[in-house]
Amino acid sequence: MTNIRKSHPLIKIVNDAFIDLPAPSNISSWWNFGSLLGICLAVQILTGLFLAMHYTSDTATAFNSVTHICRDVNYGWLLRYLHANGASMFFICLYLHIGRGLYYGSYTYTETWNVGVILLFAVMATAFMGYVLPWGQMSSWGATVITNLLSAIPYMGTDLVGWIWGGFSVDKATLT
């Protein structure tokens, strides 16, 4: 008589994914960070979406909207802290994921490694845009500091900063 977990069509899917998973015997917790990255990204998207529903970017009301989120929105304080700390956890998991790849020699798979490098650059660009696009209290300062790092590039750095900003500097606390 055959085992039901290997013969039933629906249970077989669960069996193949969880019980008889073809994984090496020396797999460790270092291999969890890809999944943790996905969870952190989902948390960031969801909390950012809910925070954006209550945030206003006007210079006069930006701070008050953050106060409104923390005090008046149900679990708004939790959304704010999950979003802020989730970003840190995302990058910790990202760097540990890269470190695991370096430790185990995953860079020898050049196509896969190059896709990962491109994804890293895309994550960095997205993080920068996520920091600048809400156009909130510290965004102008953060964007100025980050983009002024480009001015360290010889010959063309100052032109790059001017090109990104459409001018050399921004004049308000928020970017509206």
Swiss-Prot record:
Binding-site list for heme b b562: 83
Subunit structure and binding partners: The cytochrome bc1 complex contains 11 subunits: 3 respiratory subunits (MT-CYB, CYC1 and UQCRFS1), 2 core proteins (UQCRC1 and UQCRC2) and 6 low-molecular weight proteins (UQCRH/QCR6, UQCRB/QCR7, UQCRQ/QCR8, UQCR10/QCR9, UQCR11/QCR10 and a cleavage product of UQCRFS1). This cytochrome bc1 complex then forms a dimer.
Membrane topology: Multi-pass membrane protein
UniProt keyword terms in alphabetical order: Electron transport, Heme, Iron, Membrane, Metal-binding, Mitochondrion, Mitochondrion inner membrane, Respiratory chain, Transmembrane, Transmembrane helix, Transport, Ubiquinone
PROSITE patterns per UniProt: CYTB_NTER (PS51002)
Species of the source: Eumops glaucinus
Role according to the record: Component of the ubiquinol-cytochrome c reductase complex (complex III or cytochrome b-c1 complex) that is part of the mitochondrial respiratory chain. The b-c1 complex mediates electron transfer from ubiquinol to cytochrome c. Contributes to the generation of a proton gradient across the mitochondrial membrane that is then used for ATP synthesis.
GO terms classed as biological process: mitochondrial electron transport, ubiquinol to cytochrome c
Residues given in the record as heme b b566 binding sites: 97
Keyword Mitochondrion attached: yes
Cofactor dependence: heme b
Miscellaneous notes: Heme 1 (or BL or b562) is low-potential and absorbs at about 562 nm, and heme 2 (or BH or b566) is high-potential and absorbs at about 566 nm.
The protein, known as: Cytochrome b
Classification via CDD domains: Cytochrome_b_N
Details of cofactor binding: Binds 2 heme b groups non-covalently.
Chief location: mitochondrion
Membership in a protein family: Belongs to the cytochrome b family.
Annotated signal peptide: none
Compartments reported by the entry: Mitochondrion inner membrane
InterPro entries, alphabetized: Cyt_b/b6_N, Cytb/b6-like_sf, Cytochrome_b_N_euk/bac, Di-haem_cyt_TM
One Gene Ontology cellular component annotation held by this UniProt entry: mitochondrial inner membrane
